[in-house]
């Protein structure tokens, strides 16, 4: 009786095995088989005690050279210290903009463009020329003084200006300087004026030397006329084929 029960159970197992081989339950079991529990790489490093440092895994060249250069100084360089502390070597002092931003201050105002930089100094420092001035060291002012006469050079105001300033119709007496002071003040202007007495005398001697020679001269031309008369008396004026020599030829002997 026991043997019959064992045989029946064996047949049942064979039937179930045949059904499992032909059906899908075996494929699902094979696919859902749990694999080995492999932890991630970081977990493995942490378990082995080699947790990665936050800095670079390969030390910089400065650190390698310092480690290989034995005996090295007692205090390592700043780059080696930063790498040993787990910090990447960076600039020790931040830029000025970063410092201002960290302190809550706004950075410097932007630099103005080049045209504005060129325009601002000219408007600020360029000298303003007066209407009567010119860059050529006051030549226009000298011409105005010459055209106005010795009164403008000596600084004496005119009668019309006095009337306009006072508002009265009566002509004001012109302010006169003493004879010596007035002569000293007006002498430079008098010498520069083209219509002065000395200029007229020089021009008369050059343009009318025949008249001065015949009539004896007038004003400043008397000396030249007397000299020509003396030369004519000596016969020096008749040395060019009986023709009268001009003044230049007489004085220099260059010809008729």
Swiss-Prot record:
Comp. bias regions, Basic and acidic residues: 188-198
SS bond partners: 240-256
Region of interest (Disordered), ranges: 149-199
Chain ranges passing through the membrane: none
Tissue-wise expression: Expressed in venom gland.
Subcellular location: Secreted; Cytoplasm, Cytosol
Main location: secreted
Modified residues (Pyrrolidone carboxylic acid): 31, 44-45, 48, 64, 68, 85, 103, 117, 123
Key words, A-Z: Cleavage on pair of basic residues, Cytoplasm, Disulfide bond, G-protein coupled receptor impairing toxin, Hypotensive agent, Metalloenzyme inhibitor, Metalloprotease inhibitor, Protease inhibitor, Pyrrolidone carboxylic acid, Secreted, Signal, Toxin, Vasoactive, Vasodilator
Superkingdom: Eukaryota
One Pfam match: ANP
Effect on the protein upon substituting residue 34 to A: Low decrease in ability to enhance AsS activity
Propeptide segments, given as residue ranges: 24-30, 41-43, 61-63, 78-84, 96-102, 114-116, 122, 128-207, 226-234
Gene Ontology terms: biological process: blood vessel diameter maintenance; cGMP biosynthetic process; negative regulation of protein kinase activity; receptor guanylyl cyclase signaling pathway; regulation of blood pressure; vasodilation
Signal peptide: 1-23
GO molecular function: hormone activity; peptidyl-dipeptidase inhibitor activity; toxin activity
One Gene Ontology cellular component annotation held by this UniProt entry: cytosol
InterPro entries: Natr_peptide, Natr_peptide_CS
Family recorded in the similarity comment: In the N-terminal section; belongs to the bradykinin-potentiating peptide family. In the central section; belongs to the pHpG family.
Additional remarks: Negative results: does not bind to type-1 angiotensin-2 receptor (AGTR1). Bradykinin-potentiating peptide 10c-F is present only in female snakes.
UniProt name for this protein: Bradykinin-potentiating and C-type natriuretic peptides
Species this protein is from: Bothrops jararaca
